[in-house]
């Protein structure tokens, strides 16, 4: 775990994947950044590697993360993603082990260690309870509990999954904040998962495929704030 990194609950992750880039991504990111300031929530955005400097230059409340890095050190490794390079580009962290970019547990652990050395926060995705427990023992900054089968479906995780995965991580390392992902398609989903005990949630298709992505993003961040405040009355 990179100890010099700070992010506060509740937080939100928007992953544009390969749907958005350049100016179109920047326009949406600016709206998200403004909403993050308005609702006093932290937001992670994981742009294409080439857009890291663009977003890092313009964001105030948004944390810019890489979509992935490799565990290599400077030297040979054509086609690989060097942790030092994404940090130099302006990223403060990286996602690892997303369902669309899976790596094995040994590689996850090695990459977390490299990121700790370089000074990058890590948000690591996990599908099953067993995978989640194994990753929690490696000490990432953040964990995404996300059933692979539900990604992009519009169907959120069951409340049993939400509660059990949060409890499992907290039993291993209470410092790790758990983001509940997969199937978050509307503000109501955001509200429900935060009320169930999550520190965070996120969305890709729910925002990108919305009739008005900017309005959907704002609505989700408002729901995040409302649920957190309701939970902590």
Name every feature range the model reports, one short phrase each.
Residues 58-64, 87-94, 117, 138-144, ...:
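Glycine-enriched alpha-helix->loop->beta-strand junction motifs that scaffold or abut catalytic
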Residues 60-115:
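Glycine/small-residue-rich loop that forms an oxyanion/phosphate-binding "nest" at active or ligand-binding sites
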Residues 17, 92-103, 142-155, 196-217:
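Glycine-rich phosphate-binding active-site loops on the catalytic face of alpha/beta enzymes
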Residues 126-139, 184-201:
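Catalytic cores of alpha/beta
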Residues 1-81, 122, 130-140, 208-209:
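Conserved N-terminal beta1-alpha1 strand-loop-helix module at the mouth
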């Amino acid at each position: 775990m990179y100890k010099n990194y700070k992010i506060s609950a509740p937080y939100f992750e928007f992953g544009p994947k390969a749907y958005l880039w350049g100016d179109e991504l920047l326009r949406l990111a600016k709206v998200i950044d403004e909403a993050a300031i308005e609702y006093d929530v932290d937001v992670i955005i994981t742009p294409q590697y080439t857009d890291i400097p663009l977003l890092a230059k313009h964001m105030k409340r948004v944390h810019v993360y890489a979509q992935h890095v490799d565990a290599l050190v400077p030297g040979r490794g054509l086609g690989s993603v060097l942790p030092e390079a994404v940090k130099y580009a302006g990223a403060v962290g990286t996602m690892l082990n997303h369902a669309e970019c899976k790596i094995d547990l040994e590689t996850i652990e090695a990459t977390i260690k490299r990121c700790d050395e370089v000074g990058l926060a890590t948000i690591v995705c996990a599908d099953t309870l067993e995978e989640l427990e194994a990753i929690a023992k490696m000490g990432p900054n953040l964990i995404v509990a996300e059933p692979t089968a539900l990604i992009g479906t519009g169907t959120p995780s069951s409340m049993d999954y939400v509660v059990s995965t949060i409890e499992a991580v907290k039993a291993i390392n209470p410092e790790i904040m758990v983001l509940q992902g997969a199937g978050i398609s509307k503000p109501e989903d955001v509200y429900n998962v935060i009320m169930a005990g999550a520190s965070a949630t996120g969305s890709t298709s729910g925002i990108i495929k919305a009739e008005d992505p900017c309005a959907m993003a704002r609505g989700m961040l408002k729901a995040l704030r409302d649920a957190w405040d309701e939970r902590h009355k």
